[in-house]
Amino acid sequence: MDLGTIKGELDNNGYSTIKDFTADVRLMFENALTYNADSSPIWKHAKTLLYFHRKHDEHVKVKEDTNSAQPTLLRLQIIQIVKMLHLHLHLHLHLHLHLHLHLHLHLHLHLHLHLHLHLHLHLHLHLQNNQIINNNSNNNNNNNNNNNNNNNNNNNNNNNNNNNNNNNNNSNSTTNSSSSSSSSSSSSSSSSSSTTTTQKKYSDEERRNLMERINELAPDYVQEVLNIIDPNAS
């Protein structure tokens, strides 16, 4: 690379950017330093120009990098801020949703337990009420049965008393019948002794009274009374 080539590129608009031009100038100075002796004036001038060129190039590069870096830094900062905000919002939303879900599940479990306890208490109370009703009904039935048993016992006692009274009456009637029979037999015997041709006859009223008394007696007493009564009496 030499100065004539660089001049031709400048005349023909061969360089599209300044970077291409400075690259050829730097290459020209490096070639001058490479292909010339250190003691030659071309090498000295090329070294001096290359030094200034590099300073200028570094200054321009730094300036361009700074100018181009500012938007990049701003963009990076903005992107970083956005990412941080997004992450923060995401974490916040995530935590909020997590807490919300946790609270929702906690409330749901609490309601579920509350409903479960409510149903358990309701069923327990319902069963307890049914047991109380059944116990009351059983107690009432037992009381009714006891009352019926007491009434039956009282009726049995009354029947026994009536039977005893009937037995006493029957025994008394039997005794009376016996005595009357004996008296009648004695009277009949006396009458027969006095009048041998006549017998004692029962009147209709006596016969009716005897039958009524016989009907009130027990079977044993009836047989005894029938044995006492004269079968030949009309």
Swiss-Prot record:
One of its Pfam families is: BET
Composition bias of kind Low complexity appears in: 134-194
PROSITE patterns assigned to the protein according to its UniProt record, in alphabetical order: BROMODOMAIN_2
S-S pairs:
none
- Which stretches make up the Bromo domain? 1-60
**Which UniProt key words apply to this protein?**
Bromodomain
Q: Where is this region: Disordered?
A: 134-209
Which PANTHER family does this chain map to? TRANSCRIPTION FACTOR GTE11-RELATED, TRANSCRIPTION FACTOR GTE8
Q: What is this protein called?
A: Bromodomain-containing protein DDB_G0271118
